[in-house]
């Protein structure tokens, strides 16, 4: 018996037993091997956990980058197509164009649903009541944007869109407990400065002429002598002077005051100033209307983004749901507003869609409807995987290629003002991005000091403040899959 036992102890373990980490008589193994095996298993588990966490963070980052790039491409293409569609002073059917775009978008998404490519959540009355205000605001966002784009060049339009970022940031400060750091505030100052620089050619001359004309109007009332205003209203003054001195070829500046002439001269000057002011108003009304529409668009866009972020949490909509129901619920609003505001007569259609450009315009509208699907989806995607402020920041950084596209496709003039304005706006976007990055890092360091967690940028998403990047698997392309 002792010989058998000795022989069994000398039999080496087979490969399967070695692979399983035990021998045939592992119960008599030395106790010193147990802590080593436990340590080895814990190291393997730690490495595996870190690998999976880094993989998920990499997936989230790649998904966020994909969302940002997709939104940039959609934004540039939609702006160029819409500018081509509504460009021109005589185009008056913006709401009809938006109605066609939304209808094309709904048809495309519904076709994708019927082919089984995506799934769309079934709509109920609760979701309709929750989401209908969002769709109504989207109508006003797109409409005011199209009107501003109709009256403004693309570089100026893109610069003023930066002001939306400021409104969104302060909205997040009030609604989502956001925070504005000094560097972020500096970027806001640069954004406002870029807008002032870009708009200076439209704002400065009218102000200077008004002050200049008022000063000389007061002087004319006392002296009775019309004074030149450097080419402004010269035709009116010359005719007035010729009427009072028909036998002289003297210029208005050489006319000497005489008794009793103050009243007719004052009347002539008043008429001259009123006609010149009307002419100046006609020349500047086109760009002035653009600034008014742009201001309205910035305010409504900021409200839309902030309210949309809240409602997405309430409804639990996915990206395709958001895009589909945004456009679907916008159709009745657009139809009602178009019938109420726009004239659907044959003459109006001939005026807005002339025969020589009709086929091109119809194709552009259909193409813009297709692009509307893309931009609606990428907007919701970008907001979901990043934040509403980050989404608007991406739009700010996108202004440089967008402005270049306007100069390239529409021949917008390259002036020192709009060039400097675009450059300052682009720098403001970079400063803002750096400021938000430092804010995220500081928040993570503070959170790690409080919890003892790692300060790595790939740490848990709980360290991110409200409204910032959230590193989870939401970065994947958010499409629905059909349930088996």
Curated annotation (Swiss-Prot):
Protein name as catalogued: GDP-mannose transporter
Chain ranges on the Lumenal side, renumbered to this chain: 82-90, 151-155, 201-287, 343-360, 412-413
Subcellular location: Golgi apparatus membrane; Cytoplasmic vesicle membrane; Endoplasmic reticulum membrane
Keyword set includes Glycoprotein: yes
Subunit note: Homooligomer.
Location of the region described as Disordered in the Swiss-Prot/TrEMBL record: 1-34
Membrane topology value: Multi-pass membrane protein
A GO term from the CC aspect: endoplasmic reticulum membrane
Tagged with keyword Endoplasmic reticulum: yes
PANTHER family in the record: SOLUTE CARRIER FAMILY 35
SUPFAM superfamilies xref list: Multidrug resistance efflux transporter EmrE
Positions of transmembrane segments: 61-81, 91-111, 130-150, 156-176, 180-200, 288-308, 322-342, 361-381, 391-411, 414-434
Basic and acidic residues: bias regions: 1-12, 19-28
Species the sequence originates in: Malassezia globosa (strain ATCC MYA-4612 / CBS 7966) (Dandruff-associated fungus)
Superkingdom of origin organism: Eukaryota
Glycosylated residue positions: 343
Function, as annotated: Involved in the import of GDP-mannose from the cytoplasm into the Golgi lumen.
Protein family (similarity comment): Belongs to the TPT transporter family. SLC35D subfamily.
Keyword line: Cytoplasmic vesicle, Endoplasmic reticulum, Glycoprotein, Golgi apparatus, Membrane, Sugar transport, Transmembrane, Transmembrane helix, Transport
Cytoplasmic side: 1-60, 112-129, 177-179, 309-321, 382-390, 435-484
């Amino acid at each position: 018996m002792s010989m058998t036992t000795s022989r069994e102890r000398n039999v080496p373990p087979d490969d399967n037993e070695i692979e399983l980490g035990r021998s045939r008589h592992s119960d008599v193994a030395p106790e010193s091997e147990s802590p080593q095996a436990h340590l080895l298993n814990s190291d393997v588990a730690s490495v595996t956990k870190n690998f999976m966490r880094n993989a998920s963070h990499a997936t989230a980052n790649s998904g966020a980058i994909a969302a940002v790039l997709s939104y940039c491409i959609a934004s540039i293409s939609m702006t160029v197509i819409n500018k081509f569609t509504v460009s021109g002073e005589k185009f008056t059917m913006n709401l009809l164009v938006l109605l066609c775009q939304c209808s094309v978008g709904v048809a495309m998404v519904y076709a994708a649903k019927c082919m089984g490519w995506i799934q769309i959540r079934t709509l109920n009355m609760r979701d309709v009541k929750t989401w209908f205000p969002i769709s109504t605001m989207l109508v006003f966002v797109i409409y005011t944007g199209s009107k501003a784009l109709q009256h403004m060049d693309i570089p100026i339009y893109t610069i003023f869109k930066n002001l939306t970022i400021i409104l969104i940031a302060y909205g997040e400060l009030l609604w989502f407990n956001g925070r504005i750091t000094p560097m972020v505030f500096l970027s806001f100052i640069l954004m406002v400065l870029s807008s002032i620089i870009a708009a200076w050619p439209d704002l400065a001359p009218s102000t200077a002429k008004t002050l200049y004309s008022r000063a000389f109007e007061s002087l004319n009332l006392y002296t009775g002598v019309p004074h030149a205003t450097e080419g402004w209203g010269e035709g009116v003054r010359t005719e007035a002077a010729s009427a009072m001195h028909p036998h002289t070829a003297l210029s208005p500046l050489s006319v000497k005051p005489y008794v009793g002439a103050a009243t007719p001269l004052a009347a002539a000057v008043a008429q001259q100033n009123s006609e010149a002011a009307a002419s100046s108003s006609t020349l500047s009304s086109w760009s002035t209307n653009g600034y008014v529409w742009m201001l309205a668009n910035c305010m409504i866009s900021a409200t839309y983004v902030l309210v949309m972020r809240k409602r997405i949490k309430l409804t639990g909509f996915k990206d395709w749901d958001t895009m589909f129901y945004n456009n679907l619920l916008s159709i009745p609003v657009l139809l009602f507003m178009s019938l109420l505001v726009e004239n659907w007569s044959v003459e109006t259609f001939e005026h807005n869609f002339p025969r020589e450009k009709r086929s091109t315009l119809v194709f552009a509208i259909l193409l813009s409807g297709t692009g509307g699907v893309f931009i609606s989806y990428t907007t919701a995607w970008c907001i979901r995987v990043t934040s509403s402020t980050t989404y608007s920041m991406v739009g700010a950084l996108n202004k440089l290629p967008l402005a270049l596209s306007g100069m390239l496709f529409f021949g917008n003039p390259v002036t020192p003002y709009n060039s400097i304005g675009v450059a300052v706006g682009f720098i403001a976007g970079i400063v803002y991005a750096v400021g938000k990055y430092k804010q995220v890092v500081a928040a993570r360091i503070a959170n790690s000091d409080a919890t003892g967690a790692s300060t790595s940028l790939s740490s848990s998403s709980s360290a991110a403040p409200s409204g910032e990047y959230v590193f989870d698997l939401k970065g994947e392309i958010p499409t629905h899959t059909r349930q088996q």
